[in-house]
Amino acid sequence: MNAPDGLQRCFVLHRRPYSESSLILDIFSEEFGRITLMSKGARSKRSNLKGALQPFTPLLLKWSGKGAMKTLRQAEPISLGLPLTGINLYSALYVNELIGRVLMQEVSMPGLFHDYLFALTELAQADNPEPALRRFELALLAAMGYGVDFLHCAGTGEPIDPQMTYRYREQKGFIASVRRDNLTFLGNELIAISERRFLTKEQLQAAKRFTRIALKPYLGGKPLKSRELFIQMRIPRTRSMEK
């Protein structure tokens, strides 16, 4: 994919130091998808980019190069970084890691970029991050072509009955079932997932269960670092409450 002629809307997903003064950036861009950039001298004391090239800060970037790693040529922050703290910050880190693990390099996904921006905006304002996370996971699955019909029984084609139970079969959909296990969902839960509107705790839990099932093949067996960090954060807080 050719380098852009002008500035592109982007976010930093992850950054790591390179040599004494540079950074390697994993970027999610509106028009070019995921790309890897080297920012030369970004860590030096004289660099005015040191504070700007951070996750969750809306950026305008320009780069050059044809290889797997491009060179950052220009960077301008659009605004201050989104105000993410506590559990919402860890949730946003999870979203970034999910994109980095699941999306291929240099595949344009402007629609998903807008879903990502919406998710970050929601997380910056939400008391409970779970609905925003589930909506983004579902948007990510849809962007990757993971097509599931939540509104019709895969066995009969009939509309989903809110009161009935359905069992998920990968690459087929939901089939009416009397069994109850990790792969079964109530009809009202499937309708809520389809609409991405979760009115009850049970619907939200069902959405989380489904996205974990659907994302597992893409993530493999390697644990998510953001999830481990979140667990580590919760343990000290739980211990302090017990005291």
From Swiss-Prot:
Keywords, A to Z, come to: DNA damage, DNA recombination, DNA repair
Q: Does the keyword DNA damage apply?
A: yes
Q: Has UniProt tagged this entry with the keyword Ligase?
A: no
- Gene3D superfamilies of this UniProt entry? Nucleic acid-binding proteins, Recombination protein O, C-terminal domain
InterPro entries, from UniProt?
ARFGAP/RecO (IPR037278), DNA_rep/recomb_RecO_N (IPR022572), NA-bd_OB-fold (IPR012340), RecO (IPR003717), RecO_C (IPR042242)
Recorded GO CC terms: bacterial nucleoid
Name any Gene Ontology BP term. DNA recombination
Organism's domain of life? Bacteria
UniProt xrefs under Pfam families: RecO_C, RecO_N
The similarity comment for this entry is: Belongs to the RecO family.
Function description: Involved in DNA repair and RecF pathway recombination.
Q: What is this protein called?
A: DNA repair protein RecO
Tell me which species this is from. Answer: Vibrio vulnificus (strain CMCP6)
